[in-house]
């Protein structure tokens, strides 16, 4: 998949992790915006045409489920991928609530890229 001009919004309250993931996504060809919590993510979604959201679950102000709920209403064609170290029950609940997928923090970059690519491809055909 051609990643040039595809935009990922990385949402995580851990600045260092957000920066590291963003840098890797940029090196893979994506354009990336970042947010420290769900409220900041909503601002980014309002300002930019985001292709996919990669979000943590535990964050201050608005957690990943809160962000997912708003995204499903305001940007239903924008896939949300959870990127978290949480237990499997949180992962299953995220998918049940409408997340495209869940990727465990620490996963291989190729796995993350494959998931983001697939999310964008499927949303383009929806």
List PLM regions with ranges.
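Short hydrophobic/Thr-rich beta-strand motif most characteristic of the beta2 strand and flanking loop
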Residues: 29-36, 44
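Alpha4 helix (beta4-alpha4-beta5 surface) of REC/receiver domains from two-component response regulators
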Residues: 66, 86-114
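Non-catalytic signal-transmission and effector/linker regions of two-component phosphorelay proteins
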Residues: 1-7, 110-126
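Receiver (REC) domain active-site loop signature in two-component systems and cognate sites
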Residues: 59
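Acidic catalytic/metal-coordinating carboxylates
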Residues: 37-40, 63-66
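Conserved acidic segment of CheY-like receiver
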Residues: 5-16, 21-25
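Active-site residues of response regulator receiver
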Residues: 56
């Amino acid at each position: 998949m051609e990643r040039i001009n595809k935009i990922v919004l990385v949402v995580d309250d851990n600045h260092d992790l957000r920066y590291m993931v963003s840098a890797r996504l940029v090196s893979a060809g994506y354009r990336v915006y970042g947010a420290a919590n769900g409220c900041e993510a909503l601002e980014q979604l309002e300002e930019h045409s985001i292709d996919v959201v990669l979000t943590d679950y535990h964050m201050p102000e608005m957690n990943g489920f809160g962000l997912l709920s708003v995204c499903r209403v305001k940007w239903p064609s924008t896939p949300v991928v959870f990127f978290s170290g949480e237990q499997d029950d949180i992962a299953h609940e995220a998918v049940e609530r409408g997340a495209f997928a869940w990727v465990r923090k620490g996963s291989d970059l190729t796995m993350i890229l494959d998931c983001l690519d697939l999310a964008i491809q499927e949303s383009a055909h929806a």
